[in-house]
Amino acid sequence: MKPLSSPLQQYWQTVVERLPEPLAEESLSAQAKSVLTFSDFVQDSVIAHPEWLTELESQPPQADEWQHYAAWLQEALSNVSDEAGLMRELRLFRRRIMVRIAWAQTLALVTEESILQQLSHLAETLIVAARDWLYDACCREWGTPCNAQGEAQPLLILGMGKLGGGELNFSSDIDLIFAWPEHGCTQGGRRELDNAQFFTRMGQRLIKVLDQPTQDGFVYRVDMRLRPFGESGPLVLSFAALEDYYQEQGRDWERYAMVKARIMGDSDGVYANELRAMLRPFVFRRYIDFSVIQSLRNMKGMIAREVRRRGLTDNIKLGAGGIREIEFIVQVFQLIRGGREPSLQSRALLPTLSAIAALHLLSENDAEQLRVAYLFLRRLENLLQSINDEQTQTLPSDELTRARLAWAMDFADWPQLTGVLTAHMANVRRVFNELIGDDESETQEESLSEQWRELWQDALQEDDTTPVLAHLSEDERKQVLMLIADFRKELDKRTIGPRGRQVLDHLMPHLLSDVCAREDAAVTLSRITALLVGIVTRTTYLELLSEFPAALKHLISLCAASPMIASQLARYPLLLDELLDPNTLYQPTATDAYRDELRQYLLRVPEDDEEQQLEALRQFKQAQLLRIAAADIAGTLPVMKVSDHLTWLAEAMIDAVVQQAWVQMVARYGKPNHLNEREGRGFAVVGYGKLGGWELGYSSDLDLIFLHDCPMDAMTDGEREIDGRQFYLRLAQRIMHLFSTRTSSGILYEVDARLRPSGAAGMLVTSAEAFADYQKNEAWTWEHQALVRARVVYGDPQLTAHFDAVRREIMTLPREGKTLQTEVREMREKMRAHLGNKHRDRFDIKADEGGITDIEFITQYLVLRYAHEKPKLTRWSDNVRILELLAQNDIMEEQEAMALTRAYTTLRDELHHLALQELPGHVSEDCFTAERELVRASWQKWLVEE
């Protein structure tokens, strides 16, 4: 065994001081000293359990001891009588075996393949034992779940990712999917449950048993987000539901995930074979599937963006040439050819890599380099994580951890280790780039003329002449030269390394050539240089613009068209990644796909990392806003569609924020116990105003109210029990906090909750019954007007139906025409006095007479006035479709309804485009005179004369 290096021998003295009396220095072997010096996790564990160290010394870990895990664990669980005891024994067993694995790994007593096998088998053993114990307990409580033939139905668990592949790392969360075979009901219990209820409750308890931190720690962090529909989907699915989902809706990334899926425990049973046979056609196509290459290119881009987004330069998993890229290389061949080549259908990476070499899909040399690099990186990753049982893949910056890793990896010092590491990662990156290169090699652009380089590098004065700017007017030319000079002065104030200078000197002549070809060269250049000032110290982004000419062209055209986009890109340079693919840049996500795209985006972030989750939500929103604005500028989205996209995006965000808040609240307090008798969460979010009316703009805030249906006597079922209604209040407060927290990527949305019953003085969250009572007995007419533009944007079907019924009932109340007309008109006059135009000789598109608010008041008045006679008027919450309904129900002439619709969309279109120009919502007094006259005439007809 290699002796400890000098820094570690010094650290050993610190370790000795921590050791209790029974672990005196003289009683320890050289092996024990080495492991205790290397791993704080082992050190802490044997201090708490000295008998484990005795066991390690007398019975050192063996390569095949994973075969005994199940028997050892059964013995530990033999006297467990309740769930608390189960949780304690599982946690202690996991810790004891992890100490043995860390010992074997640190001292290199077994191969790295054996370590991966032991880690994976330990996880499987713990998962299966917990499942089987809970299944028996749940059957005693609720009866045994059976199919129509009375056959008992098991819970099958798919282990995904590295767990499925038998390649789990030392400190890893586990990705699981739960399934059961057939529908039916429980038999033999005190009360009958259908199988879906039984397995959902059991699944929740299983996650709690494995995941919930106690004084003994946790077993594994459980991640269920890979299941169909992610967090918004059922926790457990029947085989039929799984099959429907993967056949009808399965995405490419879900195919990649399913390659490694493995059934935990008894995998040879009838149901296990049925599940495997059902999933195989989805994962492995019968033909050679080259269609997957474009998806893989997209994923390659996603990896590169991930590295940039999170600054993962020292990350041995996600960085260039890291573990993820080796996994990716192997999956390329599995997904393209796996359907035809059974040898490529292995879940484990190394056997698949051997099969790839045997089929001559990679050269023997490349395959061997990847194999050696993979084992090197996995050993380094596992050693790094075993120091503190910490889930990290980032190389350390502190000297002690570096010394530990260099010693354990058998290097003299850290520079030696990083030298070999760099060589391995370079080999991986080379194969990765060769395998998934772009369709066409980039044509080498002809070198720019010397004059463009002179313009950038020679700092010409305002009165200098240069032929390349001769086509510009004198003023424009002077402005361009001044902007270049100012930009260079800004650069002098910043610390830019040699590589950054080199990239900038390559980029700027190209950029100036493209910008100065435009008539608005000075304005465009001023916006782009402001952006560049923010990113000059981040060479990665400069390289992106330098290496992808198409991205540079998109940047120039978007900044020229919209200062809003330019300032967004300047504030959040991560968005520059969106410029790489024009197919997505000018094609916003399908309106019904925002939730799924966001779910996929959030999968890359640990569920328990609130800070990263908040960042990811904001980054996703900004990227989608950019794509919507780009399509708007390009003219591919009409105004109605712009608002549709902005509204669907907001709803996806609300969905994700509620999910995040719910998970946090349930972890803290448990769930309100009235939910045990029903599906769902007993919670709804109602959107008012522009959100409710599908009319959001680029900078709109969200008008929200929160409802629940929690009984007065409900309590939560967690260890920190609180009143059920208090739970929903804290949930709503948490949602508001998640929306408004300012991170480096800004806030998510401004949220206004003042439209709730009793306004700012009322409770933040209201029971459904109290809301109905308030609307019937206390609400003012303007609150009923607001209800016209309200709809549930998140919520259970029961609460949604309840809200819709209350809304319909309130809107169809009989109202006296003159009184209503007076109240609506007076409210509008108050608003105009308060919000009307403060700018002389300007027309405020929204607030002034003849503007958008007048049209909204006309539609609201007519719905409240006539819905008693024509209940169909309550169907929609947006102005355009309400105007259609008014015409269809013979309340307004079709010609007037169409004219008001045209005026409304024209004015809204102008507001969108003013927002893109970062201009306020008012225009010259002589604009839109025809539209304003038309609106005034309608106002006079309905709210003055009628």
Swiss-Prot record:
Top class in the EC scheme: transferase
Region (Adenylyl transferase): 449-946
Statement: the UniProt record of this protein carries the keyword Transferase: yes
The keyword Iron-sulfur is annotated on this UniProt entry: no
EC number: 2.7.7.89, 2.7.7.42
Record-level Gene Ontology MF annotations: [glutamate-ammonia-ligase] adenylyltransferase activity; [glutamine synthetase]-adenylyl-L-tyrosine phosphorylase activity; ATP binding; magnesium ion binding
Biological process per Gene Ontology, one example term: regulation of glutamine family amino acid metabolic process
Record keywords: ATP-binding, Magnesium, Multifunctional enzyme, Nucleotide-binding, Nucleotidyltransferase, Transferase
Superkingdom: Bacteria
GO (cellular component) term, any one: cytosol
Range of residues in the leader sequence: none
Function (record text): Involved in the regulation of glutamine synthetase GlnA, a key enzyme in the process to assimilate ammonia. When cellular nitrogen levels are high, the C-terminal adenylyl transferase (AT) inactivates GlnA by covalent transfer of an adenylyl group from ATP to specific tyrosine residue of GlnA, thus reducing its activity. Conversely, when nitrogen levels are low, the N-terminal adenylyl removase (AR) activates GlnA by removing the adenylyl group by phosphorolysis, increasing its activity.
Family: Belongs to the GlnE family.
Protein's name according to its UniProt entry: Bifunctional glutamine synthetase adenylyltransferase/adenylyl-removing enzyme
Gene that produces this protein: glnE
